Swiss-Prot record:
A motif (PPPSP motif E) lies at residues 1604-1611. Residues 1407-1614 are cytoplasmic. The chain crosses the membrane at residues 1384-1406. This is Low-density lipoprotein receptor-related protein 5. Widely expressed, with the highest expression levels in liver, heart, and lung and the lowest levels in brain and spleen. GO terms for molecular function: coreceptor activity; Wnt receptor activity; Wnt-protein binding. InterPro entries: 6-blade_b-propeller_TolB-like, Cueball_EGF_LRP_Nidogen, EGF-like_dom, LDL_receptor-like_sf, LDLR_class-A_CS, LDLR_classB_rpt, LDrepeatLR_classA_rpt, LRP5/6. GO terms for biological process: adipose tissue development; amino acid transport; anatomical structure regression; anterior/posterior pattern specification; apoptotic process involved in blood vessel morphogenesis; blood vessel morphogenesis; bone development; bone marrow development. It comes from Mus musculus (Mouse). Residues 1002-1025, 1474-1498, 1567-1599 are annotated as: Disordered. Phosphorylation of cytoplasmic PPPSP motifs regulates the signal transduction of the Wnt signaling pathway through acting as a docking site for AXIN1. Residues 340-601 are annotated as: Beta-propeller 2. Residues 1257-1295, 1296-1332, 1334-1370 form the LDL-receptor class A domain.
């Protein structure tokens, strides 16, 4: 059957036409008007019209399914399953637009019915499995049925008798009846029923009609299901909806896409009303007779009901009802003001509330936007706010219960907010952050933020409060899982439980009983303990695969389960268990609350306890707290902003202490600090800077701990000293490990090495920007204090008779230096020239850190564990500031007076392009190391000639003969096991191969990082780059691959071009491109035979330069100017050179080379690196003389590359520099200065000699010539010793004969059994030479002289060409008791063999002598091909439509065949749509709506799965215009449950080359598979690898990059 043409929908009719149609209904019409849904629109058609054309009522719809009307108002209602909405329009209003009636809580509203008397809408939802009712405007919505429903569909009303009817096509198909108020539910039809789709009531005859799409009938029965009769049977294809008028039934059919009619009594008089519809769905007769008016008890005063008045079949024939979740008061008329006990639920992208007052547990979505990944949720019963955390938005937000008033409270310095808790008494909000590993608090409005706990937290999760007792409890699921307790101010912290815990996710307090409950997602238990830590016991441990959210209200504990996708509850005493919600994905936290009940109080409830900011009730007293940056006054209630304060480092923390009051030590909430050492600040930006000698970084943050960032993170070893130049906005530091003093801008830019010579263990730094001096101490063999200009020049020793001077500080007012001496245990001072030395304090146990402010000096003492102060001139009035401190490294006073003054750099950076460096009386402009300053413009130019060398985790730059700057580590992120490096001098990109088998690139300042190749992006995941080289002219990168043993080429923009060289035995490794001459040189590490080869850049013209004197050549470099090739052999430990042609081989160096791994040429020198000796050395490249060590003590060396400037003239002169020489792929410079275009091996050059295209479509038994006039030759001619291709490519790269083949003298290989068979098979007849030799002992000699194995004799198969091995077999056969069967087959066998030989000879003569050789001009292939490769597209069709046929002019040659499609011809459509295949598993919240079904009973009534539809043209899938989404996302019964969050710990190795292995799946939802269970967090910090999949609901839709979602909970990725 051909597909009926789909007509474009007509334009909407003029409003006047609808008015005329509607008004025509007022008088009795001769034929009814049919209202039907057509997916994309709702239409009207006159069933008795002449033209039978439909009129559009509503257009531009997504997926209109069910439809009904209210005749008295002219209103039309319909459901849209794509928009998940119920909508309305009017027939009698000009230009009426569609209105939304119900837009939330719907998933698949399949059925719709209008109660025209009670003015209600009823509908079914086959996904939520509910039947609901609401007023016609959508208000007072109520769920009537939610249990024992399984795919409800059609619904019909009989308001006169108070009944509703519906069909259910689930596991137990049936038709049910109930009162319209939800009472007297009864099954009336449950036999001989399969897919009951359509349903309608004959109000006049009191009959019920329904259509069954599977059994293909229309039946009727009495309204109680009795007296069932057939109306139409057997001849229906796929009836969907039906209605009636008078004696006529009307129905829609999915397969015919038509509306049909018949007599309702007999089923006869069938006719087609309207055909060629887009997709006819529900249908109604738009007539007054279908909605007769009558009086009901609800007419007057809504029956006395406050909300819903629903008709009923029982006296008084109506019932009052309340909206979902609200209880009816005892008077039976009035509803309560709202739900009292509510379960608040956080899902991934929405919040929901579930009333616990009513048994339906319907979840209602809060209308709050921009929820991306909600985690935890809580509620404030006083103000009615819902609070939640969102770890994708990185914020804490709140809104009212109805979704209004949404606010963002906290969205700065918050990484992964997890648990949340409301202190409804003190009006504070607590939360845990598993990213920053903190517990913090604010006021409920988001102000007065303070960190309470920041130490010894690993993965804090749930948090609950006990305001009455002043305690808080939280869980930590880190390496040492535990449940802890502390006061509400974070003090008096102690561990409550730390044994037999895995992932304690949920936590709940029973305030009345004094008990603490928790759920563990790893041990799969719910446990309880007294709040004092006693009497621990297990409440539940059955079928708890992965608890996450957890809460308690009254007698019940509620929890969410990630794997079961359910919300359940258990009685806390009886342990009885119920399921609240089942099969709802993306479940996170939940909170059960009584929305109006406030429990408990404390002194903070009265005037905030007298506190100005935060009030904390604790078990001992009420305490006031201050937000970050404020200090508490001596009244212990008021917080102020301090004028000055002390800041000090103490290993992993940085603290601030008030100078005014004691006991005010506050840890600055900084993340990622390991071992802070030096400390300074920038008062103008309120920044604090510190060095970390463990992380080897310099970092900064605001004084409140926010915006932590690394300023310097490369090339540091032990940065012990640091100082901020607050005028020039520069940062200075001293590195004891590298023996350098460096400077950079405050953001880390323009880094310059200032001093690196004659430094011996530099330590503390101090700056005097006003005077232009820098001061530092040295701890080397001769300790001293040194001064220099701030540009690093004019160094001089100020103090030389000193011990280990530490923490140098300056009194800017009195112009004096202060320092601590660790050897003499004194604090000393001098003037700024090192003179007038005086001891300020002596006999100190161990003074270390030092600072000065006003009239005092402040110092730390490691032995006393204290901070003290004293008079700065006399050392008197010593005062203890703080005790009980360990290892305070540095100390300073944060105050503006410490950073005052002016110099030239304050204004416009001194007009300098990069660095403005103060010097006495002025300033000097400076540049980043290796950059050159232009004195006139004061701008800096990057270096053009330099060396790059790589280590395992770093790439450095150096200029060998530059005495002004040493080598510098480049700020390149993510370097891991760097193997090879290269550089593009045009675009200034560094390229490297890393340990993850990627080729990456970035600018030398670390910007614009990108990846050229990776296992996940490449065509083959088995790629392992070894070496790389760049052709700067054609903008391509060549690289060798260890895994595939190929040479590949990429464009520098990242596009892969393909393979240029591969061979069966090739193992190319080191590579060097000589683009100026069009060649590449490479080492070929074949088994036991290393070679150095040369080839053209397209892999052709291969030439072996050297095969001897090589063992393991590891690196190559080309010097084009000198015309030399250099290489180093790691096993022979020598460096050699030769001409580019391979001549004049010369050994340059072979002494004291231990482990060479790379070499390069720069200027007059040849450089190499030696990994074992940790050195970079060089010699003169022509003679090998003047060997010099360039750099020493460089560990883990891996590569070296020289960069020289390429002039514009030199570049422009290259033939490939302009537009790649016009080539589409590879451009090669020829000797005459012109370009030659070529292609990778999988493509061929087309006739225009510029463009590469697919190879010619030679048949599988043919060989494709690379270039030339001839495209295809028979495969047998390949490697036969006679070149047939014009370019002789058929004789290139011929394989070595296998063990079962005989090698002919001219290279041809023939079957070994054809050797000495009496007939020449080699072209040179060498297989028949020397055939008189004696056969081996285990061989049989044929009559022809051929030798075959003895075991092949008499095996019933002729192995000798003359068949002599099968002769005389019966004579030589051992005696047997069996009677031999008579056979006379020997003669015919010999005849057949001889015939075959004759035919073969004829064929050979025909092919070789008589037949004209094929040339491209006479072939059927497109002659635009000039070259080719032996690959044939699967669906090639020769030009002219011919798919096969002999070569023209060659009648005796083979035909050229191409593969043909098995699917069908053009325009065919698939039998099903994979996107909507029945039973397809999806993990999306919007589409995962299945439940775990028992074994299959019925396939769903869908065109996609109905066998009767497989041979038709219309399928309801997104593949054809019929629909963009199936009307019903059918789910096959018995399929697996929807996918769950990826539940494996994925550990990504830095250097692994293996692919991901397939996952295993849960067979039992009640057990975890240790040790690889799903981690209990949406964002695990342990998963940092770029290819890893975070095991959380956050990955439920994507399952990490391109991998498909698993069809069930996964437990292992091993």
């Amino acid at each position: 059957m051909e597909t009926a043409p789909t007509r474009a929908p007509p334009p909407p009719p003029p409003p006047l036409l609808l008015l005329v149609l509607y008004c025509s209904l007022v008088p009795a019409a001769a034929s009814p008007l049919l209202l039907f849904a057509n997916r994309r629109d709702v239409r009207l058609v006159d069933a008795g019209g002449v033209k039978l054309e439909s009129t559009i009522v509503a257009s531009g719809l997504e997926d209109a399914a069910a439809v009904d009307f209210q005749f008295s108002k002219g209103a039309v209602y319909w459901t849209d399953v794509s928009e998940e909405a119920i909508k309305q329009t009017y027939l009698n209003q000009t230009g009426a637009a569609a209105q939304n009636i119900v837009i939330s809580g719907l998933v698949s509203p399949d059925g719709l019915a209008c109660d025209w008397v009670g003015k209600k809408l009823y509908w079914t939802d086959s996904e939520t499995n509910r039947i609901e009712v609401a007023n016609l405007n959508g208000t007072s919505r109520k769920v009537l049925f939610w249990q024992d429903l399984d795919q409800p569909r059609a619904i019909a009303l009989d308001p006169a008798h108070g009944y509703m009817y519906w069909t259910d096509w689930g596991e137990a198909p049936r038709i049910e009846r109930a009162g319209m108020d939800g009472s007297t539910r009864k099954i009336i039809v449950d036999s001989d029923i399969y897919w009951p789709n359509g349903l309608t009531i004959d109000l006049e005859e009191q009959k019920l009609y329904w259509a069954d799409a599977k059994l293909s009938f229309i039946h009727r029965a009495n309204l109680d299901g009795s007296f069932r009769q057939k109306v139409v049977e057997g001849s229906l294809t796929h009836p969907f909806a039906l209605t009636l008028s008078g004696d006529t039934l009307y129905w829609t059919d999915w397969q015919t896409r038509s509306i049909h009619a018949c007599n309702k009594w007999t089923g006869e008089q069938r006719k087609e009303i309207l055909s060629a519809l887009y997709s006819p769905m529900d249908i109604q007769v738009l007539s007054q007779e279908r909605q007769p008016p009558f009086h009901t008890p609800c007419e007057e005063d809504n029956g006395g009901c406050s909300h819903l008045c629903l008709l009923s079949p029982r006296e008084p024939f109506y019932s009052c009802a309340c909206p979902t979740g609200v209880q009816l008061q005892d008077n039976g008329k009035t509803c309560k003001t709202g739900a009292e006990e509510v379960l608040l639920l956080a899902r991934r992208t929405d919040l929901r509330r579930i009333s616990l007052d009513t048994p339906d547990f319907t979840d209602i979505v809060l209308q709050v936007g921009d929820i991306r990944h909600a985690i935890a949720i809580d509620y404030d019963p006083l103000e009615g706010y819902v609070y939640w955390t969102d770890d994708e938005v990185r914020a804490i937000r709140r809104a009212y219960l109805d979704g209004s008033g949404a606010q963002t409270l906290v969205n700065t310095e918050i990484n992964d907010p997890d648990g949340i808790a409301v202190d409804w008494v003190a009006r504070n909000l607590y939360w845990t952050d598993t990213g920053t590993d903190r517990i913090e608090v604010t006021r409920l409005n988001g102000t007065s933020r303070k960190i309470l706990v920041s130490e010894d937290l690993d993965e804090p999760r749930a948090i609950v409060l006990h305001p009455v007792m002043g305690l808080m409890y939280w869980t930590d699921w880190g390496e040492n899982p535990k449940i802890e307790c502390a006061n509400l101010d974070g003090r008096d912290r102690h561990v409550l439980v730390n044994t037999s815990l895995g992932w304690p996710n949920g936590l709940a307090l029973d305030l009345q009983e004094g008990k603490l409950y928790w759920g563990d997602a790893k041990t799969d238990k719910i446990e309880v303990i007294n709040i004092d830590g006693t009497k621990r016991k297990t409440l539940l441990e059955d079928k708890l695969p992965h608890i996450f959210g957890f809460t308690l209200l009254g007698d019940f504990i509620y929890w969410t389960d990630w794997q079961r996708r359910s919300i359940e509850r258990v009685h806390k005493v009886k342990a009885s268990r119920d399921v609240i919600i089942d099969q709802l994905p993306d479940l996170m936290g939940l909170k059960a609350v009584n929305v109006a009940k406030v429990v408990g109080t404390n002194p903070c409830a009265d005037g905030n306890g007298g506190c100005s900011h935060l009030c904390f009730f604790t078990p001992r007293a009420t305490k006031c707290g201050c937000p970050i940056g404020l200090e508490l006054l001596s009244d212990m209630k008021t917080c102020i902003i301090p004028e000055a304060f002390l800041v000090f480092t103490s290993r992993a923390t940085i603290h601030r202490i008030s100078l005014e009051t004691n006991n005010n030590d506050v840890a600055i909430p900084l993340t990622g600090v390991k071992e802070a050492s030096a400390l300074d600040f920038d008062v103008s930006n309120n920044h604090i800077y510190w060095t970390d000698v463990s992380l080897k970084t310099i970092s900064r943050a605001f004084m409140n701990g926010s915006s932590v960032e690394h300023v310097i993170e490369f090339g540091l070893d032990y940065p012990e000293g640091m100082a901020v130049d607050w005028m020039g906005k520069n940062l200075y530091w001293a590195d004891t490990g590298t023996n350098r003093i460096e400077v950079a801008r405050l953001d880390g830019q323009f880094r310059q090495v200032l001093v690196w010579r004659d430094l011996d263990n530099p330590r503390s730094l101090a700056l005097d920007p006003t005077k232009g001096y820098i001061y530092w101490t040295e701890w080397g063999g001769k300790p001293r204090i040194v001064r220099a200009f701030m540009d690093g020049t004019n160094c001089m020793t100020l103090v030389d008779k000193v011990g280990r001077a530490n923490d140098l500080t300056i009194d800017y007012a009195d112009q004096r230096l202060y320092w601590t001496d660790l050897d003499t245990n004194m604090i000393e001072s001098s003037n700024m020239l090192g003179q007038e030395r005086m001891v300020i304090a002596d006999d100190l146990p161990y003074p270390f850190g030092l600072t000065q402010y006003s009239d005092y000096i402040y110092w730390t003492d490691w032995n006393l564990h204290s901070i003290e102060r004293a008079d700065k001139t006399s050392g008197r009035n010593r005062t203890l500031i703080q005790g009980h401190l360990d290892f305070v490294m540095d100390i300073l006073v944060f105050h503006s007076s410490r950073q005052d003054g002016l110099n030239d750099c304050v204004h416009s950076n001194g007009q300098c392009g990069q660095l403005c460096l103060a010097i006495p009386g002025g300033h000097r402009c400076g540049c980043a190391s290796h950059y050159t300053l232009d004195p006139s413009s004061r701008n800096c130019s990057p270096p053009s000639t330099f060396l790059l060398f790589s280590q395992k985790f770093a790439i450095s730059r150096m200029i060998p003969d530059d005495q002004l700057s040493p080598d510098l580590v480049l700020p390149l992120h993510g370097l891991r096991n760097v193997k090879a490096i290269n550089y593009d001098p045009l675009d200034k990109f560094i390229y490297w191969v890393d340990g993850r088998q990627n080729i990456k690139r970035a600018k030398d300042d670390g910007t614009q990082p990108s990846m050229l190749t990776s296992p996940s992006q490449s065509l083959s995941p088995d790629r392992q780059p070894h070496d790389l080289s760049i052709d700067i002219y054609s903008r391509t990168l060549f690289w060798t691959c260890e895994a595939t043993n190929t040479i590949n080429v990429h464009r520098l923009d990242g596009d892969a071009m393909g393979v240029v060289l591969r061979g069966d035995r090739d193992k190319p490794r080191a590579i060097a491109v000589n683009a100026e001459r069009g060649y590449m040189y490479f080492t070929n590490m074949q088994d036991h035979a290393a070679k150095i080869e040369r080839a053209s850049l397209d892999g052709t013209e291969r030439e072996v330069l050297f095969t001897t004197g090589l063992i393991r050549p590891v690196a190559l470099v080309v010097d084009n100017a000198l015309g030399k090739l250099f290489w180093v052999d790691a096993d022979l430990k020598r460096i050699e050179s030769c001409d580019l042609s391979g001549a004049n081989r010369l050994t340059l160096e072979d002494a004291n080379i231990v482990q060479p791994v790379g070499l390069t040429v720069l200027g007059r020198h040849l450089y190499w690196i030696d990994r074992q000796q940790q050195m970079i050395e060089r010699v003169e490249k022509t003679t090998g003389d003047k060997r010099t060590r360039v750099q020493g003590r460089v560990t883990h060396l891996t590569g070296i590359h020289a960069v020289e400037e390429v002039s514009l003239e030199e570049f422009s002169a290259h033939p490939c520099a302009r537009d790649n020489g016009g080539c589409s792929h590879i451009c090669i410079a020829k000797g005459d200065g012109t370009p030659r275009c070529s292609c990778p091996v999988h493509l061929v050059l087309l006739q225009n000699l510029l463009t590469c295209g697919e190879p010619p479509t030679c048949s599988p038994d043919q060989f494709a010539c690379t270039t030339g006039e001839i495209d295809c030759i028979p495969g047998a001619w390949r490697c036969d010793g006679f070149p047939e291709c014009a370019d002789q490519s058929d004789e290139e790269g011929c394989p070595v004969c296998s063990a079962s083949q005989f090698p002919c003298a001219r290279g041809q290989c023939v079957d070994l059994r054809l050797r000495c068979d009496g007939e020449a098979d080699c072209q040179d007849r060498s297989d028949e030479a020397n055939c008189d030799a004696v056969c081996l002992p285990n061989q049989f000699r044929c009559t022809s002289g051929q030798c075959v194995l003895i075991k092949q004799q008499c095996d019933s198969f002729p192995d000798c060409a003359d068949g002599s091995d099968e002769l005389m077999c019966e004579i030589n056969k051992p005696p047997s008791d069996d009677i031999p069967a008579h056979s006379s087959a020997i003669g015919p066998v010999i005849g057949i063999i001889l015939s075959l030989f004759v035919m073969g000879g004829v064929y050979f003569v025909c092919q070789r002598v008589m037949c004209q050789r094929y040339t491209g001009a006479s072939g059927p292939f497109p002659h635009e091909y000039v070259g080719g490769a032996p690959h044939v597209p699967l669906n090639f069709i020769a030009p002219g439509g011919s798919q096969h046929g002999p070569f023209p002019g060659i009648p005796c040659s083979k035909s050229v065949m191409s593969s043909m499609s098995l699917v069908g011809g053009r325009g065919s459509v698939p039998l099903y749509d994979r996107n909507h295949v029945t039973g397809a598993s999806s993990s999306s919240s919007s589409s995962t709506k299945a439940t775990l079904y028992p074994p299959i009973l019925n396939p769903p009534p869908s065109p996609a799965t109905d066998p009767s539809l497989y041979n038709v043209d219309v399928f309801y899938s997104s593949g054809i215009p019929a629909t963009a989404r199936p009307y019903r996302p059918y789910v096959i019964r018995g399929m697996a449950p929807p996918t769950t969050p990826c539940s494996t710990d994925v550990c990504d190795s830095d250097y692994s080359t293996s692919r991901w292995k397939s996952s295993k799946y849960y067979l039992d939802l009640n057990s975890d598979s240790d040790p690889y269970p799903p981690p209990p967090t949406p964002h695990s910090q342990y998963l940092s690898a770029e290819d890893s999949c975070p095991p959380s609901p956050g990955t439920e839709r994507s399952y990490c990059h391109l991998f498909p979602p698993p069809p069930s909970p996964c437990t292992d990725s091993s």
